[in-house]
Amino acid sequence: DLLRVISHPPKRFTPLYPEVDFIRVKSYQGTETTGTVTLVSDIDLDVAGRDVVLIEDIVDTGQTLEYLKTHFERYNVKSLATVALLVKESRVTVSHSIEYIGFNVKNEFIIGYGLDINNKMRSINHLREIREL
């Protein structure tokens, strides 16, 4: 949805046509963080000397975001901005800034709209808290 709006914004805005790539990391088992970030698949684009925007769905402790920032610094990017749809502000344990935050949320497990639990419930078209499994 974000890419669609950026590429086809309302008439008062100029459209942007960013190059998009995806990096996959894993740090959860079920509803609990493992404390370790594992790189599942890396980007294919050459981002050296370029401005990069890292978009995170949710920031819990911030360890994954810290890992990704360090990872992208190795590529010698010109600049790195971070965006997060959801931030569990009370759980963030690392000292880095997130330039753009959609919503601060409580310490609940959230699914839907791309967020999953064990690779399930990702396709729900809205966000939802899970209080019990």
Identify what each model region corresponds to.
Residues 1-133:
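PRPP-associated nucleotide enzymes
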